[in-house]
């Protein structure tokens, strides 16, 4: 593979600094280099600096490289989406119309729609069918500047289909340029056959599903939907602690619909991140900040459900690290546009443009434990970059509703543009 030399970027937003999730004022630091340049070799970043510095450093090797002129352009790390439900069958556009007619999330779910509808379609789909559908979503992510995504199971709610989803994610990770970090989420909902006997389903997850996930190394994380009428905090804790014993890092869908103690539980079990958090209590925010839990906020979901967004500004001011995500899923956020999510983070949660970019790169990477290789432009990290057809990071959030991606590289290979 030839080296790639990107030069003359108007703004090179490296987001370089201390590795790991940024908090407080550090979320505003982008480490921008004007007239910036990056040299990528063997899939990794070999040098970062001004164009003049790299011209001097590689004076005898410039003829070897594929040269990319980024004059007038913004260059950033590849975006990271730390919360998606990318592997699923079918579609649920009818529910969108139902919501506009007055149905709530739980109304649809209790009527057999929602997660249960997708479970039926995912159970019926073959692995190859799921590969085909999910590959198209990954293509769309790449076109919007995303080079790494987290991908959850949770649309099976039985051993066979949950494992099928995770095996599909593994195959996709081997076949597609966009990297997938797998999460087991058998505790996404209670299947209809266990209604009224929820503890038995919790036992099934703990005794049968989690051991297979761990044995086959199909996931890194274990997620649970801690919510009223889904899984109680006590049930959620059992599932997360069982996963920890098998080496799976806890994540938790928390306080999305009502304040239910999910944020506090995230702190208690040492979750790497807590998701949604629309209704998180002030005490829960304080507990998460003290425990180092990353708040993974999903403003597109709040918009789609016409709910008030999470308290992103309060969380950052309280010392929490905040990441943002599309929550790509068929029911409440059918989007692959992280640039849109960055804009919504600014508009609905009062993040600054710099904070939104940090939340979509190094903090998002930290929420899925890949900050050592992606999320910033630093020597030794993967050559994951986006060149945008705009000149400043502020424009990225300001000029919303338009895809400004010009080119995308994953591990030094151009995959878009």
Set out the residue ranges of the language-model regions.
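Metal-coordinating catalytic core of metallo-dependent amide/deamination hydrolases
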Residues: 114-134, 139-140, 147-260
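Short, compositionally biased
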Residues: 62, 398-408
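Histidine-rich, glycine-flanked metal-binding segment
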Residues: 2, 13-76
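Divalent metal-coordination and catalytic microenvironments
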Residues: 9, 38, 43, 72, ...
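Metal-associated gating/positioning segment near the N- to mid-region
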Residues: 61, 65-133
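Active-site-adjacent C-terminal substructures of enzyme catalytic domains
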Residues: 249, 259-376, 388-393, 400-402, ...
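Conserved beta-strand scaffold positions in the cores of enzyme catalytic domains, especially
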Residues: 5, 64-69, 182, 408
């Amino acid at each position: 593979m030839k080296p790639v030399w990107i030069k003359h970027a108007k703004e090179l937003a490296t987001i370089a600094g201390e590795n790991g999730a940024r908090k407080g004022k550090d979320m505003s630091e982008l480490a921008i280099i004007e007239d910036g340049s990056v040299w990528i070799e063997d899939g990794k970043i070999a040098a970062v600096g001004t164009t003049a510095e790299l011209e001097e450093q590689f004076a005898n090797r410039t003829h070897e490289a594929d040269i990319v002129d980024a004059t007038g352009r913004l260059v950033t790390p590849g975006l990271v989406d730390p919360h998606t439900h990318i592997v699923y069958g079918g579609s649920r556009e009818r529910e969108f119309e139902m919501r506009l007619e007055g149905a709530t999330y739980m109304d649809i779910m209790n009527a057999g729609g929602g997660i249960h509808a997708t479970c039926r379609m995912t159970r019926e789909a073959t692995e190859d069918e799921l590969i085909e559908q999910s590959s198209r979503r990954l293509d769309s992510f790449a076109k919007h500047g995303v080079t790494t995504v987290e991908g959850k199971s949770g649309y099976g709610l039985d051993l066979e289909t949950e494992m099928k989803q995770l095996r599909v994610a593994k195959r996709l990770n081997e076949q597609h340029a966009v990297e997938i970090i797998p999460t087991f989420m058998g505790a996404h909902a209670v299947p209809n056959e266990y209604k009224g006997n929820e503890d038995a389903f919790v036992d099934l997850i703990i005794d049968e599903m989690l051991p297979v996930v761990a044995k086959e190394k199909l996931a890194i994380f274990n997620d649970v939907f801690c919510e009223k009428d889904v899984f109680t905090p006590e049930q959620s804790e059992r599932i997360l602690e069982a996963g920890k014993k098998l080496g799976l890092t806890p994540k938790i869908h928390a306080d999305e619909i009502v304040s239910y103690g999910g944020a506090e539980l995230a702190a208690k079990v040492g979750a790497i991140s807590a998701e949604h958090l629309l209704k998180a209590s002030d005490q829960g925010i304080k507990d998460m900040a003290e425990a180092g839990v990353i708040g993974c906020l999903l403003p597109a979901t709040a918009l789609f459900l016409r709910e008030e967004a999470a308290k992103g500004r309060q969380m950052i001011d309280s010392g929490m690290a905040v990441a943002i995500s599309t929550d790509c899923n068929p029911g409440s956020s059918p989007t692959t546009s992280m640039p849109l999510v960055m804009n919504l983070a600014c508009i609905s949660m009062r993040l600054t443009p710099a904070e939104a970019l940090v939340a979509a790169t190094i903090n998002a990477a930290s929420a899925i434990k890949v900050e050592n290789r992606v999320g910033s432009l630093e020597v030794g990290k993967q050559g994951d970059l986006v060149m945008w057809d705009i000149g400043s990071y502020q424009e990225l959030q300001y000029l919303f509703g338009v895809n400004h991606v010009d080119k995308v590289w994953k591990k030094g290979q151009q995959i878009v543009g």
